[in-house]
Amino acid sequence: MKFIPHTDEERRQMLKHLAVENTDQLFKDIPSELRLNRDLAVEGGLSEMELQSHMNSLAGLNTGVDQTICFLGAGAYDHYIPSAVKHILSRSEFYTAYTPYQPEISQGVLQSIFEYQSMICLLTGMDAANASMYDGASALAEAALMACAVTRRDKVLVASTLHPEYREVVKTYLHGPGIEISEIAYQEGLSQLADIDQKLDKKTAAVLVQYPNFFGCIEDLGKIAEQAHAKGALLVVCVDPIALGILKSPGQCGADIVVGEGQSLGIPLSYGGPYLGFMACKDKYLRKMPGRIVGQTVDVEGRRGYVLTLQAREQHIRRDKATSNICSNQALCALAATVYLSLVGRQGFKQVAELCLQKTAYAKELLAALPGYQLPWQTPVFKEFVLKTKEAPEVINRELLKENILGGLDLGGYYPELAGHMLFCVTEKRSRREIELLAARLGAIS
Amino acid sequence: MKVPSELKYTKEHEWVKIEGNRAIIGITYYAQDSLGDIVFVELPSVGDAVEVEEPFGVVESVKTASDLYAPVSGQVVEVNNEPMDSPEVVNQDPYGQGWMIMVEMSDPSQIEKLMSAEEYQALIEA
């Protein structure tokens, strides 16, 4: 089988039509010193069987949550996924990451997105949610841009308790438009309210915080909302949706825009993606929200129907003026989240959150009681907590891996002042036996 | 197509009513008719500067979103909230209740470059 579609004869005809002698002439505008001038350093092809075997051996080098007991979180979580999620997801009528280009024909997809938006609104306590975004970090950055557009201001305050990689993404997004970023100091694992007050000014478009934050600690959103609003700034909250099963919703606490990573909602850990960003806001900011929305309406005969709205700004005529580059979509991941939420149900979702809370509390108590380990802060946490260790985190993790345990995140790389501290995560999937095993192994290491 | 004779026009389908040093700006009957049902209007704030031939706002209809281009340069001294609160007013009364902004002109000679009603009529019939 030929994989290169053009025959020599076809190439000759094309060149003749273009009145050039050979293909090289087509590239003559590129200076020769910039051209590769040699063959690519890749080997010849493999047969399908050889390739499959090669890929399998590469895949075998990975360590996944199926082979290990995972206490690693920090933005990517090992939650239980009901098996029905993947079966519904792989139905061919749903199986695309795109929202449809002839949207109104695809009523089923539109309805699923409408349900998704409705669930995100319920979870976050916001009025409107868009049809989804790339991931939590880019959704947060887009929310910062949106807040600047709403307030017509050009500075944002970012909590240093926010995921360090999310902060990097925010910096990248805000660099182009020249928006100033100021970071809020933390104390006892929480954003320092006094520092927020000090840094908030009439130029500040928004305060960005995470809830629960990167350390698993639960920020006082109500207080931060008051501070932000007093200066005319918006409160942007980046949430772990699972936590919203038991925590007061950001909307109830006064948030204006809520974003987050939806991976926890039925999307597997798969080397970092594809993930799901969600974004919701108060009604009055709806028009400044990037992306599109699926709306519910009735047709001329009064029958229920769904429509894709707010897409013209981004997709068609005004693309150059769009505040965001969200022109593709994570519809399949949004569908996974929708199916997950509908399967676990309101009560089940609350139970997942409660199990995370209880199991984390149990692990925290067991680990802190071990010699050589202590809790740096007494702040309430949800599904993650920081543990100070005597032995180097790197050594600890290497030892744990020998026992098939994925340990916590070494915080020193992100927060130099927290060298010798680890971030552990306990989801509802961890059993009592596994938590006790972790404690036993850690006890043996120190 | 209604093209009131006392107004000036741009090729981007805005109309301008001159009152002393001030220009009242809206979009034409033809523009609203071509856009279809208008669902959203975004306008600048009082005090903002607008630049001739540069976008100053957006009208969004069920089928498209279009920029509004300033016919003259100057400072926005008044903004009509009605198109923002009830965008359909632009469809219903483009030359009246659907007006958009009033600008204090910085260079009134720019008016000379605008089209007369006859010229605009010829443009939309072309």
From Swiss-Prot, chain A:
It is an enzyme of class 1 (oxidoreductase). One of its GO terms (molecular function) is glycine dehydrogenase (decarboxylating) activity. Signal peptide: none annotated. Keywords: Oxidoreductase. It catalyses: N(6)-[(R)-lipoyl]-L-lysyl-[glycine-cleavage complex H protein] + glycine + H(+) = N(6)-[(R)-S(8)-aminomethyldihydrolipoyl]-L-lysyl-[glycine-cleavage complex H protein] + CO2. GO terms for biological process: glycine decarboxylation via glycine cleavage system; nucleoside metabolic process. It comes from the Bacteria. The keyword Protein biosynthesis does not apply. Coiled coil: none annotated. InterPro entries: GcvPA, GDC-P_N, GDC_P, PyrdxlP-dep_Trfase, PyrdxlP-dep_Trfase_major, PyrdxlP-dep_Trfase_small. Pfam families: GDC-P (PF02347). Its EC number is 1.4.4.2. Belongs to the GcvP family. N-terminal subunit subfamily. HAMAP family: GcvPA. The glycine cleavage system catalyzes the degradation of glycine. The P protein binds the alpha-amino group of glycine through its pyridoxal phosphate cofactor; CO(2) is released and the remaining methylamine moiety is then transferred to the lipoamide cofactor of the H protein. The glycine cleavage system is composed of four proteins: P, T, L and H. In this organism, the P 'protein' is a heterodimer of two subunits. PANTHER family: GLYCINE CLEAVAGE SYSTEM P-PROTEIN, GLYCINE DEHYDROGENASE (DECARBOXYLATING). This is Probable glycine dehydrogenase (decarboxylating) subunit 1.
